[in-house]
Design a protein with these regions (language model features):
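Residues on the lipid-exposed face of transmembrane beta-strands in outer-membrane beta-barrel proteins
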Residues: 16-18, 41-49, 107-113, 127, ...
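Membrane-embedded beta-strand positions of outer-membrane beta-barrel proteins
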Residues: 12-14, 58, 123, 160, ...
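Outer-membrane beta-barrel transmembrane domain signature
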Residues: 178, 182-251
């Protein structure tokens, strides 16, 4: 079947932003500073389908950003052990490291039925998570430093209620009042969710534990569970407006 323009509205946008900061050696030696590169990609999609009193709005937004800076790390030998010089001082290397500073995507689906000019009733479903692995710090990006990844965590919010939409184009505020709401938190990765330890037995047969990484359970207290559900009520306020004839600025 053909897509009818009078029933469908589609918006799509995206952007790529980058910055480069560079200092020469004399400046760094006197005032300090570090050369760096930052890249951020943004994408947004909005689709609205309307038929009589029924409307369903679907939105997707995503943001992913990385930056690269020089960091000081201790040199390792062939066996992976930290190296020191004859005086016992650490042997340090300087290298450029990429590190994630922004990573999120959000999917929203909102079906509704119109009650009056500005009021409607329906539901809102929001899901958000991230694309790539997240680590403890710029210099700690190994498996034992893993803190997050896709669906660890993941958040799902479902609400039922009424929605008010402002009739003024210059003040497009949307207020959703939901007496019934459900919040779900997911942490699917066992390695991240649980505390990881290494057990060793000494010469006397005594067992000792060395922590490899702490638990990042995102509020899920039971280590054998991968999700948590909570109920309640919610209020959501949205304001989405573009400025300028070409919509160069959006808030």
């Amino acid at each position: 079947a053909a897509i009818r323009k009078e029933r469908n509205y589609l918006e799509f946008g995206g952007g790529l932003q980058g910055t480069l900061t560079s200092y020469n050696d004399p400046w760094i030696s006197v005032s300090g500073g570090d050369n760096s590169i930052a890249l951020t990609a943004v994408i947004g999609l909005r689709h609205v389908f309307t038929k009589n009193l029924f409307t369903i709005e679907t939105k997707f937004s995503a943001k992913l950003g990385y930056n690269r800076m020089k960091v000081e790390t201790q040199r390792l030998d062939a066996d992976g052990n930290p190296m020191v010089d004859d005086s016992g001082n650490k042997i340090m290397d300087s290298e450029g490291v990429w590190f994630k500073n922004q990573d999120e995507f959000v999917v929203s689906v909102a079906p509704s039925f119109k009650m009056s000019e500005n009021w409607s009733y329906g539901s809102i479903l929001n899901f958000r998570s991230q694309f790539v692995n997240g680590y403890k710090s710029r210099t700690e990006q190994k498996k034992e430093h893993l803190k997050s990844k896709f669906m660890t965590p993941g958040y799902l919010d479902i609400s039922l209620g009424i929605t008010y939409k402002s009739p003024k184009p210059k003040f497009p505020i949307v207020i959703n009042l939901s007496p019934i709401a459900l919040n779900a938190t997911f942490a699917e990765n066992d390695w991240i969710r649980r505390r990881q330890v290494e057990e060793r037995v000494d010469s006397e047969g005594k067992k000792t534990e060395t922590e490899i990484k702490p638990a990042y359970n995102y509020g899920i207290e039971d280590p054998d569970k991968t999700s948590k559900y909570e109920g309640g009520s919610s209020i959501q306020i949205d304001f989405d407006r573009t400025f300028g004839k070409t919509g160069f600025l959006r808030y």
